[in-house]
Amino acid sequence: MSRTVKLVLGAGVVVLVAVLGFLVASSGQEAVEQGFVVAADLDPEYLTLPGEQQGLPTEGPVPAETWRGIGQAAPLSEGRALWVPRWSYKTAADVRTIVSKAASANFNILLFQVRGNGDAYYSSVYEPWSDRLTGSLGRYPGWDPLALAIQEAHAAGLQLHAYVNVYPSWLGVTPPSSSTPQHMFQRFNAQYGNQWVQWDRNHSPMGLNEQYLAANPAHPAVTEHVVAVCRDIVMNYDVDGLHLDYVRYSGPYFSYDPVSDRLFQAQGGGDRGDWQRAQVSELVGRIYDEVLPLRPGMALSAAVWPIYKDKWGWVTYGTTTYAGYGGYFQDCRGWLKSGTMDFIAPMLYGTAVMNSRDRFNTLVADFMVESYGRQVYAGIHADYASFSEIEARINMARRAGCQGQAIFAYSVVDGKGYWDEFRAGPYAQPAKVPAMPWK
């Protein structure tokens, strides 16, 4: 459905925001259907969604592989992004250390997380300061993480992209405390009841649980709120880009809520999967069309599911996890084709990919075939016992023609002590961030 049609259908519905995980599924089968891998996968502090699998499935042990001739000279133009999740820092000194170490290893982009679950790591008029910084939701920590990160990154010659969790909205069984501004959980519940969150196929709404709660991509107020949050960041901070994560539904059997049912029927029915993909793409398109022009030249990117469509039988439907297009209604290649995304970072890790160079290479090549003149940064997890595994994947991505890599994550690289290996190996020569000639 076009963005114009969506706006017409959504007219009169109050604008709202969301980024909630979801209620633990009512049955083991439904829990399994919610399998997820995200940019934050495998970090010890990361909390998965209910029923979420740690990675993608394998059908048995993956044989050892030998690769020859994968060495590749470092290009002069290459994106070298580093995911910096919000748990990587609590103090100004932490941020300075992050920038210093990344710069020393010749990274050139920091994907710096500033929104986790309806909270903020910057001065926001829409959402309260995160309680991770002070212990109290809404309390000013005495410094501004995003402002400092931008200042330090730019001084060191790095780009700073504000990294935003899109649909997760709260975390834990205890509701957010009172704050100024009021958290979206309380505000939206007061305005819309439970119809702004995702519902399962039994028409049961998500509720507070020990993991993420997730907002309804089809609720116009959710879309409006997320667009407003992104606009607020871009208008007030000198960011070089916006980076989206969790920009998808929570699984193939969400969201069967009254708002979605009504809007879907209003358009005359049809294929519900196509309609759900259009809801997510609507948000992406609005951010690109309405927010990016406020800061000309900035980039929009997203961490996306590692398997777009399962052409190889690697996904066992109904038992573990799904492909991005059909299981999470994330049409990332459609965004590239429509010109509403500058680069994607497929998260090429998880159990089905992590230990297989062949599968990594297959997926990288598959994404490059349909990149439509936009850019692909291969997402590589740093949690390998040997740095040679990371270097091999960087070289495979280069050979496939990827414009860059995104390494997950600062805390993993730091824990492994791989900074010197990056600097002495694949990132020995500094590189410029690739130009975006369509800008």
Each PLM stretch: what is its role?
Residues S88-A105, R132-A156, H225, A278-D289:
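Aromatic- and glycine-enriched glycan-recognition loops and surfaces
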Residues F107-V114, D144-M206, H243-Y246, V284-A299:
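Glycine-rich, aromatic-flanked loop segments that form ligand/cofactor-binding clefts
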Residues Y122-T134, P168-L208, V247-G268, G313-Y322:
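Aromatic- and acidic-residue-enriched segments that line the glycan-binding/catalytic groove
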Residues Q159-Y167, L171, H243-S250, D274-Y328, ...:
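Aromatic-lined carbohydrate-recognition surfaces of secreted/lumenal glycan-active proteins
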